[in-house]
Structures are given as structure tokens and as C-alpha cells.
């Protein structure tokens, strides 16, 4: 079961149900777990997630495009934020410090990430220094104070995970243990024909072992997609053990897939490299998860990492 937002009249619901304000129930389906992009290529917001839209507790997200000289200003309020530079260069002025020429890669397939973490109560202004500048922002409620921090490409640990055609690259932007309260953020590259988030895993219940060690966290997750060619696509399945949720989504450029619970593997179409940016928040600042026992055996069959990895590296910057 999953707790619902405090504004809901319900307290706890079966895993397959989300609460709809104003009454009624709605099952999680491919139609409400996939947010299709309406990007026109113009400046402005081209992907957006709210807790109201997702019917969950924590994650907000917006991806926006700015041309050179355009600015996006706001205040973190009672939230902690991460701004991930998808492409281009910007200047960021905040009440917690100023950051000049943030960003370097022209797009996510051409370099490692820059990002900025801001805690609550911070005013900020992001000004694009290049045309077509793109930034993805995520924010969650917080009741703690943490220092602002610029994350550079050298700060993002790179992991080549899996094996054979289940190989992928993970860049940790805000990993577990980062000086924040709830946010976790990684970006993942999956070469064409490969699987990622595989074997399927879940993080939808908070569990500790007999020694008190966390073995699974209850986390909401956003998948924000980019493909290296505009016609590319990936498939993502979200399902629970009892199949009360079993949804298959075709994800294209700038689409968002919501993972409120359940297992959630991805496969990238042959010929196209899939990128997704993951934001997570929930019961712990963690990535603790549990594999689907039906598929965990595949790990024993891996013999090596796909030679197409890494897709991006510090050498590109």
C-alpha cells in the first residue's frame, strides 16, 4: 500500500489504485503513466510533472528551453531543487551564491552533466548564454537546510552496469549520501538493442533487515526520455507482482514515464541510443531496490560490458 497526499481523503490504498480528488478511483494504466511530449521546438516548458498529475506525494519536474539572453527565475520556497543542464551554457544567480558559465555539453549525447542543488528558501535566476539551452528541474518538499552545491562533470560517478545486451551507463548526479534530504538523480544511457533497469527491479515498500539495514526504499520515480535521433523510441513496462498494474509504454523524445510503484524495465530500439533522466524521492535518500525474483537469474549469464559503452565521458568535455 502507498500513502496518498495529505489533501486526499483516503489514507491508504491498494497498490493498483490512485486517489482522484473529487471522488472516484483510477487504475494505473499506460494512458496515465505516460506523459506524451508536446514539444514544438520553441522556448518554454516542454515536459512537466506535478504530484497532482501523478497522484503521488513528492516529485515535481519541469524541462524548459531558453534562447540566449532569456531567463527563468523563481524561489525554492519550502522545496529542495536540482537543476540538471541538458544542453548549452547558462549563468545562475542565487541568494546562496552565483555560478558563471554552468554547462558545457551541447546535448546529453555529447558530454557529462552539470547540475545545481539548492535547498529551501533560495531565490534563483537562470540565464541562457547559448541558444537552445535546456534544463530539467526537479523539486520536492523539505524541512531541512543544506548547502547549495554545483555538480560538475568530474563530480558524477560513472558506472557501467549489467552485461552483454543488458549493459548501460549510469551517471550519478545526486547519489545516495548526497548532502540533501530526499532527492536522488541519475542519468542513464542505453545503447540500441539493449535493456536497462534490468533485471526488473522495484522500490515501492520501505523494508529493513534484522540488523536495521535498509534493503528497499519506497520511492516515486520519473523517467524523462531523450533519443539520439528524433524518430527513435524505447519501450518501458511498469508492472506489479500480482499484475494489478501491467502497463507497456512506447517512450519517445521528451516523453515522461511515471513509476509510482512496481517493476519497470526498459528496452532501447535497435539503432537508437536511449537517454533517460531519473528523479526519485520517497521514504529514504536511497536507491535500495529489489529485483523481480523471476528474472534475477539473468545476472549470472552476463559475460562482459557492451563495447559501445561509455556513451559519454569526461574526454568529451
What are these regions (language model features)?
Residues 132-171, 239, 277-317:
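Double-stranded beta-helix
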Residues 1-12, 16:
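Low-acidity, Ser/Thr- and Arg-rich intrinsically disordered low-complexity segments
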Residues 39-73, 80, 164-221:
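A short glycine-rich, His/Asp/Glu-containing loop-to-beta-strand
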Residues 120, 128-130, 137-141, 174, ...:
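Short, structured patches in soluble enzyme cores that scaffold and shape functional sites
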Residues 61-65, 115-117, 137, 185-189, ...:
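Conserved hydrophobic/aromatic beta-strand scaffold that supports enzyme active sites
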Residues 109-123, 127-128, 250-271:
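Conserved metal-binding segment of the jelly-roll/cupin
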Residues 77-100, 192-193, 205-255, 261, ...:
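Glycine- and acidic-residue-biased ligand/ion/polar-headgroup-sensing regions
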Residues 53, 60-128:
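Extended, compositionally biased flexible segments
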Amino acid at each position: 500500500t502507498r500513502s496518498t497526499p495529505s489533501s486526499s481523503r483516503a489514507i491508504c490504498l491498494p497498490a493498483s489504485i490512485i486517489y482522484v480528488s473529487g471522488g472516484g478511483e483510477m487504475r494505473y494504466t499506460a494512458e496515465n503513466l505516460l506523459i506524451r511530449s508536446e514539444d514544438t521546438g520553441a522556448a518554454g516548458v516542454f515536459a512537466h510533472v506535478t504530484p497532482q498529475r501523478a497522484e503521488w506525494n513528492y516529485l515535481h519536474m519541469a524541462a524548459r528551453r531558453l534562447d540566449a539572453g532569456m531567463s527563468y527565475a523563481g524561489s525554492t520556497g519550502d522545496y529542495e531543487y536540482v537543476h540538471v543542464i541538458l544542453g548549452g551554457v547558462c549563468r545562475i544567480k542565487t541568494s546562496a551564491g552565483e555560478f558563471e558559465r554552468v554547462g558545457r555539453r551541447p546535448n546529453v549525447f555529447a558530454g557529462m552533466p552539470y547540475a545545481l542543488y539548492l535547498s529551501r528558501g533560495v531565490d534563483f535566476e537562470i540565464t541562457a548564454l547559448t541558444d537552445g539551452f535546456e534544463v530539467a528541474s526537479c523539486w520536492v518538499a523539505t524541512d531541512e537546510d543544506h548547502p547549495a552545491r554545483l555538480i560538475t562533470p568530474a563530480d558524477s560517478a560513472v558506472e557501467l552496469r549489467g552485461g552483454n545486451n543488458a549493459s548501460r551507463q549510469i551517471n550519478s548526479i545526486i547519489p545516495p549520501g548526497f548532502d540533501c534530504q530526499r532527492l536522488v538523480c541519475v542519468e542513464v544511457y542505453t545503447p540500441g538493442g539493449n535493456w536497462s533497469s534490468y533485471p526488473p527491479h522495484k522500490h515501492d515498500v520501505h523494508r529493513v533487515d534484522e540488523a536495521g539495514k535498509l534493503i528497499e526504499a519506497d520511492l516515486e520515480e520519473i523517467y524523462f526520455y531523450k533519443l539520439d535521433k528524433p524518430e527513435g523510441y524505447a519501450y518501458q513496462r511498469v508492472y506489479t507482482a500480482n499484475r494489478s498494474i501491467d502497463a507497456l509504454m512506447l517512450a519517445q523524445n521528451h516523453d515522461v514515464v511515471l513509476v509510482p510503484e512496481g517493476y519497470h524495465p526498459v528496452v532501447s530500439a535497435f539503432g537508437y541510443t536511449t537517454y533517460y533522466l531519473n528523479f526519485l524521492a520517497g521514504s529514504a535518500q536511497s536507491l535500495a531496490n529489489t529485483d523481480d525474483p523471476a528474472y534475477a537469474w539473468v545476472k549470472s549469464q552476463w559475460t562482459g560490458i557492451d563495447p559501445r559503452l561509455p556513451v559519454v565521458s569526461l574526454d568529451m568535455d
